[in-house]
């Protein structure tokens, strides 16, 4: 199945072609700088791959010439052949400072190392330093902050501490206003712009923990995408006759057409391999997959 794998690899490289051609405003570098990166090195990496090419084959045949004579001539046909190509490409390698690490070996950014994990939604922002979510404190964000015991008046009457937050309460003859902090008589008054904003701020503080975690995950995905795009870009640049940004539309169309032909050839190779795998001789002495001594 080696031929099938080689064909699929070549087709996958051409599929990245249009994505890697920079558009307007794409110049200026795409590698995102980050904290903890002490240096970036450009390494020369050997690249080995198989590429296809058209080999001319001359087929003799007889034809009718002038004077009703039979002449011998030939026609030129082409067949797809494979050859091994060895090239060198440049790749960027990031070196992290002490106390920082890469998420994976090919990452171009570094993240801080905390010997003990940051709890309750905290994020490790520097070596052994956590940035805690609202309502939590301590070196590892393991301490619940009792907002009710601070010097700031958060509730007009009663304050109840909760894990990572607090709630306000009122005496039995009063009701809690829409801001969640002020007590008032009877039914609460229609919400004002200030009270609505206050509630929105509290909701935003609660969502901050989830948002930070999502940003952290998205940064990891971006690093992996940058790595894959860099590898694919190096592969495509190695097999193209000119850099992708110098390709003309007609050249892109031609390469895309070659990709379609390669896909068709790969399907034919797979069909032949399946048929050959089902073949066997009458005495099984030379059948594929059968070894008799």
Curated annotation (Swiss-Prot):
GO cellular component assignments: cell surface; extracellular region
N-terminal signal peptide: 1-25
Disulfide bonds: 38-97, 65-71, 96-110, 114-124, 118-130, 132-141, 148-159, 155-168, 170-183
Carbohydrate attachment residues: 50
Subcellular location: Secreted
Domain of life: Eukaryota
Keywords: Calcium, Coiled coil, Disulfide bond, EGF-like domain, Glycoprotein, Repeat, Secreted, Signal
Coiled-coil residue spans: 195-232
UniProt KW Membrane keyword: no
Domain EGF-like: start-end pairs: 111-142, 144-184
Alphabetized GO MF terms: calcium ion binding; signaling receptor binding
EMI domain: residues covered: 34-112
GO BP annotations listed: vasculogenesis
InterPro entries associated with the record: Dev_Signal_Modulators, EGF-like_Ca-bd_dom, EGF-like_dom, EGF-type_Asp/Asn_hydroxyl_site, EGF_Ca-bd_CS, EMI_domain, NOTCH1_EGF-like
Name of this chain's protein: Epidermal growth factor-like protein 8
Species of origin: Homo sapiens
């Amino acid at each position: 199945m080696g031929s099938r794998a080689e064909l699929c690899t070549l087709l996958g490289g051409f599929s990245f072609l249009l994505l890697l051609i920079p558009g307007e405003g794409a110049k200026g570098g795409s590698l995102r700088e980050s904290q903890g990166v002490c240096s970036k090195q450009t390494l020369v990496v050997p690249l080995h791959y198989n590429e296809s090419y058209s080999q001319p084959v001359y087929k003799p045949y007889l034809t009718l010439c002038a004077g009703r004579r039979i002449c011998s001539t030939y026609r030129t046909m082409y067949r797809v052949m494979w050859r091994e190509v060895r090239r060198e490409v440049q790749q960027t390698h990031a070196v992290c400072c002490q106390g920082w690490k890469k998420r994976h070996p090919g990452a171009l950014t570094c993240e801080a190392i905390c010997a003990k994990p940051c709890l309750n939604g905290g994020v490790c922002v520097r070596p052994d330093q956590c940035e805690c979510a609202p309502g939590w404190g301590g070196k590892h964000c393991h301490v619940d902050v009792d907002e009710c015991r601070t010097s700031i008046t958060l509730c007009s009457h009663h304050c109840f501490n909760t894990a990572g937050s607090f709630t306000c309460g009122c005496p039995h003859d009063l009701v809690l206003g829409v801001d969640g902090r002020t007590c008032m008589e009877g039914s609460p008054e229609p919400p004002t712009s200030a009270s609505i904003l206050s509630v929105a701020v509290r909701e935003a503080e609660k969502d901050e923990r989830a948002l930070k975690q999502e940003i952290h995950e998205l940064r990891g995905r971006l690093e992996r995408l940058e790595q894959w795009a860099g590898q694919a870009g190096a592969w495509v640049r190695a097999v193209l006759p000119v850099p992708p940004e110098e390709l003309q539309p007609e050249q892109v169309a031609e390469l895309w057409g070659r990709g379609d032909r390669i896909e068709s050839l790969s399907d034919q190779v797979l069909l032949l391999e399946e048929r050959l795998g089902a073949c066997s001789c009458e005495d099984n002495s030379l059948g594929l997959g059968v070894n008799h001594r």
